[in-house]
From Swiss-Prot:
Cited PANTHER family: 50S RIBOSOMAL PROTEIN L21 (PTHR21349), LARGE RIBOSOMAL SUBUNIT PROTEIN BL21M (PTHR21349:SF0)
Family: Belongs to the bacterial ribosomal protein bL21 family.
HAMAP family membership: Ribosomal_bL21 (MF_01363)
Quaternary structure and partners: Part of the 50S ribosomal subunit. Contacts protein L20.
Keyword hit for Chaperone: no
Record has Ion transport as a keyword: no
GO cellular component, one term: ribosome
Biological process annotations from GO: translation
Pfam families named among the record's database cross-references: Ribosomal_L21p
Protein name per Swiss-Prot or TrEMBL: Large ribosomal subunit protein bL21
Length: 103
């Protein structure tokens, strides 16, 4: 059984027991969260597709950890003009473990 849900403006395909990295959520580690924006649920041959969301579709998950991703370097450079600019960015994330899918 798997499902597709929406969180942080992105869509994620998950199955039970899987750990997913999402955009940062303001929820403490160890707490549970329910995602109601379920776009699709598939159980073998039976597939439910939402318009836009599946009625009664809920994905339950437990927050495992928070952290920051790898550093991305941004470089601006103009040749022959003595202009160089560097900037770095590390995006916050939340790891969640899917504990249940229902539709």
């Amino acid at each position: 059984m798997y499902a597709v849900f929406q969180s942080g403006g992105k869509q994620h395909r998950v199955s039970e027991g899987q750990t997913v990295r999402l955009e940062k959520l303001d929820i403490a580690t160890g707490e549970t969260i329910e995602f109601a924006e379920v776009l699709m649920v598939a159980n073998g041959e039976e597939v439910k597709i939402g318009v836009p969301f599946v009625d009664g579709g809920v994905i339950k998950a437990e927050v495992v950890a928070h952290g920051r991703g790898e550093k991305v370097k941004i470089v601006k450079f103009r040749r022959r003009k003595h202009y160089r600019k560097q900037q770095g960015h590390r995006q916050w994330f939340t790891d969640v473990k899917i504990t249940g899918i229902s539709a």
